[in-house]
């Protein structure tokens, strides 16, 4: 496989130099004077130096520094034998700093498109992290990551009762400010100047919570005058979930500059239990509303979609009330049956073909029709009524 593969490590040119080695019971001391190696992937460690020390009470790594031709990392840590014996007592303190060069980032990430490798900034990824505590209470006292010119990320959190599957909990808060992230669009193998663009100067606030089997997440993205807000939760024991998405005045043209799509305001809410939609015990409910979408010369609004799943029967309703389209549609489908079993009823009271650019001039009367369809095992029935015209 391309890049570094932890399941296939083949080392060569290994050099190790140790000094002041001492070990007796809990008393230990070792000074790493020299360590270097090369991996088959191209990853190279040019230097690893540091010291490990322990006595009857404490275990220390006063300094451990690793260098590659493109990166450097250093770690300091201290803990107590008490933590080793009883992980919920004692205390661990650790600090980690790293500057990871482009070559090593791409190597560790594995097989990536050539367009992404070319577009990725030629600057080091700077990471700083710190933690204090034990498995009963662990604090993430500091965390930051920065790729100069691309993004800066900071955060912290708290982890509680990590060994207790029922009582464990976690709180993680992250803040991100973006600059030029357009190189990420090359992950799909296309050049960064293609149809999709990631705008500059976006802000992202994310909060994650866990309590036992319950997981919760909140996300707020701001881009210019636009905003995207997501609030979601999932219970791993009951498979109950909910999600609320609100988009307010988000300028999609900033993301798709070569398209004619502009401002979007919409909301989506979902709640349910179970993820096997063919099961009679699964329930789900969805409600979506399009308040405003500017596409080309069209201003689209007044569209609502609702849907439910209960007893393996999916039902959906679509209502459109705007200048382009006035209609009501209802549909249902049996999800658990091995054959097609569903029906559709569509009632269009006004379809403006002239405004849509299909008809050369306004129609004397608006186009209106009713369409119904049923699928029963291996047979499909359809019926269309438009004025005096009826088709089966």
Where are the language model's segments positioned?
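Interface amphipathic segments
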Residues: 1-392
């Amino acid at each position: 496989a391309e890049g570094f593969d932890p399941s296939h490590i083949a080392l060569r040119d290994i050099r190790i130099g140790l000094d002041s080695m001492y070990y007796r019971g809990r008393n230990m001391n070792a000074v790493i004077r020299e360590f270097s190696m090369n991996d088959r992937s191209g990853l190279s460690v040019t230097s690893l130096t540091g010291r490990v020390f322990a006595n009857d009470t404490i275990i220390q790594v006063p300094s451990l520094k690793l260098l590659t031709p493109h990166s450097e990392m250093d770690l300091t840590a201290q803990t107590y034998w008490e933590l080793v014996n009883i992980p919920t007592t004692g205390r661990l303190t650790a600090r980690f700093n790293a500057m990871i060069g482009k070559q090593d980032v791409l190597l560790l990430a594995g097989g990536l498109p050539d367009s992404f490798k070319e577009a990725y900034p030629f600057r080091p990824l700077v990471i700083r992290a710190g933690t204090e505590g034990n498995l009963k209470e662990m604090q993430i006292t500091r965390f930051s990551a920065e790729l100069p010119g691309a993004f800066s990320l900071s955060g912290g959190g708290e982890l509680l009762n990590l060994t207790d599957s029922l009582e464990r909990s976690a709180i993680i808060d992250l803040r991100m400010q973006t600059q030029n992230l357009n190189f990420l669009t090359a992950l799909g193998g296309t050049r960064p100047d293609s149809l999709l663009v990631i705008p500059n100067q976006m802000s992202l606030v994310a909060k994650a919570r866990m309590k036992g089997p319950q997981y919760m997440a909140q996300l707020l993205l701001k881009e210019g005058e636009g905003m995207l807000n997501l609030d979601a939760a999932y219970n791993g024991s009951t498979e109950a979930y909910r999600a609320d998405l609100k988009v307010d005045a988000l300028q999609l043209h900033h993301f798709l500059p070569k398209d004619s799509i502009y401002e979007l305001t919409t909301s989506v809410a979902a709640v349910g239990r179970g993820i096997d939609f063919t099961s009679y015990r699964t329930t789900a409910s969805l409600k979506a509303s399009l308040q405003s979408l500017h596409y080309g010369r069209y201003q689209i609004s007044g569209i609502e979609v609702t849907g439910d799943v209960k007893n393996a029967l999916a039902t959906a309703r679509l209502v459109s009330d705007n200048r382009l389209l006035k209609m009501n549609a209802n549909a249902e489908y049996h999800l658990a049956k091995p054959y097609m079993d569903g029906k559709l009823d569509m009632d269009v009271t006004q379809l403006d073909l002239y405004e849509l650019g299909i008809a050369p001039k306004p129609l004397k009367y608006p186009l209106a029709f009713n369409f119904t369809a049923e699928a029963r095992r291996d047979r499909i029935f359809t019926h269309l009524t438009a004025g005096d015209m009826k088709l089966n």
